[in-house]
A protein has these predicted regions:
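The feature marks the first
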Residues: 2-3, 13
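Short, recurring structural edge motifs at helix starts
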Residues: 4, 74-75
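Core segments of cupin and vicinal oxygen chelate
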Residues: 6-10, 17-61, 95-98, 102-103, ...
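Short amphipathic alpha-helical segments
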Residues: 11-15, 82-84
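Short hydrophobic beta-strand elements that form part
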Residues: 16-17, 88
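Arg/Lys-rich, alpha-helical DNA-contact motif
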Residues: 61-62, 71
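Mid-chain, well-packed structural core segment of small domains
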Residues: 75-105
Length: 116
């Protein structure tokens, strides 16, 4: 990398964890580890059924998405790999995306969108 990075990573916004059974994930992350359950989200297009949980307070809140596939045989396979993705707070997202693509970084086929 020859040029300076033109953006700053401000923090972690989310961590997405996949498995074949989100109830088992929830039993560990909510019941044992104490994360707060927020709400559920389901999308046939994204092949995902997830529980959205949180840890931390205020500016230090991190979303933890516990995801299972609606159909394990279809793509995307949200359970493979188990650590599916992380979300970062970035000070200049359009600049970051353009620069990272120039560095050869690939993004999800669905693109970058708010809350994902």
């Amino acid at each position: 990398m020859s040029e300076a990075r033109p953006f700053n990573v401000l923090g972690v916004q989310q961590v997405a964890i996949g498995g074949l059974d989100k109830n088992k994930l929830r039993a560990f992350w909510v019941d044992i580890m104490g994360l707060r359950y927020g709400h559920s989200y389901k999308s046939e297009k994204e092949n995902v059924d997830e529980d959205i949980c949180e840890t931390g307070v205020g500016a230090f809140t991190v979303e933890v998405d516990l995801m299972q596939p609606i159909d394990p045989d279809k793509r995307p396979k949200v359970h493979e790999p188990a650590l599916n993705h992380i979300g970062l707070w970035i000070d200049d997202l359009p600049t970051a995306v353009a620069w990272l693509e120039g560095q050869g970084v690939r993004f999800t086929p669905g693109g970058i969108r708010k809350g994902a």
